[in-house]
């Protein structure tokens, strides 16, 4: 499935000497392929980050009936401060450097607020102790293994349709994500930096273990490349995109190309809408 942005915006770029180079497309960040690219980038960063830590846990935090927060109108709601205080208590209970990627969301059926966390460098006992106040449980703690499935489950928030508010007077807090700074920074070392810089235009991607390639997140691009190098990459990607389109037009004709492109765009958004409806029915 393609990760090429289907609704890009264009910027007019100029070379240092003032010569206008034309317009170069930039990803919109909102279409289905862009969202898939974000998920892929975060998945890579979390896997890489886990390679340098002592432990990794997939944690779900829920509220007891008497502890669940409620809005002024009586609706059960997420409270970001509860999660932040949880991390603060965690840090007090250990000398290890804790890092995390966390989301707050509502259950598809019950709409109860809960939190999913990919949590590094803590053990089960400390997590359970931190989800208590004055030795009283705030709710239940569920543990799972950190794997492709649990990372994907946590990251589904990125491509999930934002549902709050769902009706007039819905005063619940919106679903959210929070994360530690520098997740996956360990990927960039002397060897990998040299590899990427050796062929700047051709190696602006992440090599995966199965030989496939993943789009490079902006986090790595900003650390790897200077503005001039980013410009070279943008021009190169535009050229590759134009060559791909020209070859396809020569193969199937311009009318068929435009028809297939429009059909692809429509199907991408249909798939995204269908997934959203399926989540609401679960």
Segments (PLM) and residue ranges:
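Intrinsic-disorder/low-complexity loop/linker signature
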Residues: 17-19, 51, 62, 73-74, ...
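Generic structural motif
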Residues: 36-37, 64-66, 122, 146
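A broad, low-specificity signal marking well-ordered, structured residues that form hydrophobic/aromatic
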Residues: 29, 57, 100, 141, ...
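Signature for HUH/AEP ssDNA processing cores
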Residues: 38-109
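Conserved His + Asp/Glu catalytic blocks
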Residues: 97, 107-113, 117-244
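C-terminal non-catalytic accessory extensions
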Residues: 238-282
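Hydrophobic side chains in beta-strands
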Residues: 33, 61, 104, 117-119
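DNA replication initiation on ssDNA origins
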Residues: 1-47, 246, 250-256
């Amino acid at each position: 499935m393609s990760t090429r942005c289907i609704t890009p915006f264009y910027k007019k770029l100029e070379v240092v000497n003032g010569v206008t180079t034309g317009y170069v497309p930039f990803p919109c960040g909102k279409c289905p392929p862009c969202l898939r690219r974000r998920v892929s980038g975060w998945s890579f960063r979390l896997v890489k980050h886990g390679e340098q830590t002592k432990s990794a846990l997939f944690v779900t935090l829920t509220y007891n009936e008497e502890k669940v927060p409620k809005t002024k109108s009586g609706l059960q709601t997420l409270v970001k401060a509860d999660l932040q205080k949880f991390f603060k208590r965690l840090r007090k209970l250990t000398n290890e450097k804790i890092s995390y990627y966390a989301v707050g969301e509502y259950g598809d059926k019950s709409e109860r607020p809960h939190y999913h966390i990919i949590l590094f460098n803590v053990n089960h006992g400390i997590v359970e102790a931190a989800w208590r106040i004055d030795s009283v449980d705030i709710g239940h703690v569920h543990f799972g293994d950190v794997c492709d499935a649990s990372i994907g489950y946590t990251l589904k928030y990125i491509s999930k349709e934002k549902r709050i508010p769902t009706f007039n007077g819905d005063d619940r807090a919106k679903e959210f994500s929070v994360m530690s700074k520098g997740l996956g920074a360990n990927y960039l070392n002397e060897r990998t930096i040299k590899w990427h810089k050796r062929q700047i235009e051709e190696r602006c991607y992440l090599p995966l273990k199965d030989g496939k390639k993943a789009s490079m997140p902006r986090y790595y691009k900003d650390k790897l490349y200077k503005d001039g190098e980013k410009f070279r990459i943008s021009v190169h990607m535009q050229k590759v995109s134009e060559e791909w389109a020209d070859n396809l037009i020569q193969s199937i004709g311009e009318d068929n190309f435009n028809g297939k492109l429009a059909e692809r765009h429509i199907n991408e958004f249909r798939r995204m809408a269908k997934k959203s409806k399926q989540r609401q029915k679960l």
